[in-house]
Amino acid sequence: MQVDVDLQDAYSSSTAQVPIAAETWLTWFNRWFELLHPSLPPACSYELCLRLTDDGEIASLNSFYRQQPQPTDVLAFAALEVEVPRSPPDQTELLHLGDIVISVDTAQRQSLAGQHSLTVELAWLAAHGFLHLLGWDHPDPASLEQMLKQQSILLAAVGLENPALESFI
């Protein structure tokens, strides 16, 4: 089983350059999937969309979907949470997990403030979004702490240093 990643580069107005190749994203998501897939419905393969964008687009999405008219770092739209009538999953079909949208502008600012690389920040945000696609949430401090610890595990699994958790709480 594997995860196919539809990588969309939509950060043309951003001043930051994404230091992560498409193949690296694919490797990371597949490694994270290996660690977390037992909780997913069975399928022959899985897919997700990762959209790297700028503050303008993510602010528009954040306003429309969350009624918060400002940029944010990451949004996740989990396909498995959508309440639509569907038949039981067919193990021979591709299962779409959802979409992750990351503002490269906000990630750049957060990496500078947290004194870690843009690569680490983008991976951290992608891991956070990926967990949301798999059903994780953080409605309270205890669940947020658990989710942040899981993100640390995911970053370590792909050989990235763990940013200081205090900068994310």
Curated annotation (Swiss-Prot):
EC id: 3.1.-.-
A GO molecular-function annotation: RNA endonuclease activity
Binding site for Zn(2+): 128, 132, 138
Keyword Zinc: yes
Alphabetical keyword list: Cytoplasm, Endonuclease, Hydrolase, Metal-binding, Nuclease, Ribosome biogenesis, rRNA processing, Zinc
A single GO cellular-component term on record: cytoplasm
Domain of life: Bacteria
Cofactor: Zn(2+)
Cofactor note text: Binds 1 zinc ion.
Cell location: Cytoplasm
Listed GO biological process terms: rRNA processing
Family statement drawn from the similarity comment of this UniProt entry: Belongs to the endoribonuclease YbeY family.
Record's function text: Single strand-specific metallo-endoribonuclease involved in late-stage 70S ribosome quality control and in maturation of the 3' terminus of the 16S rRNA.
NCBIfam families in UniProt: rRNA maturation RNase YbeY
Protein name listed in UniProt: Endoribonuclease YbeY
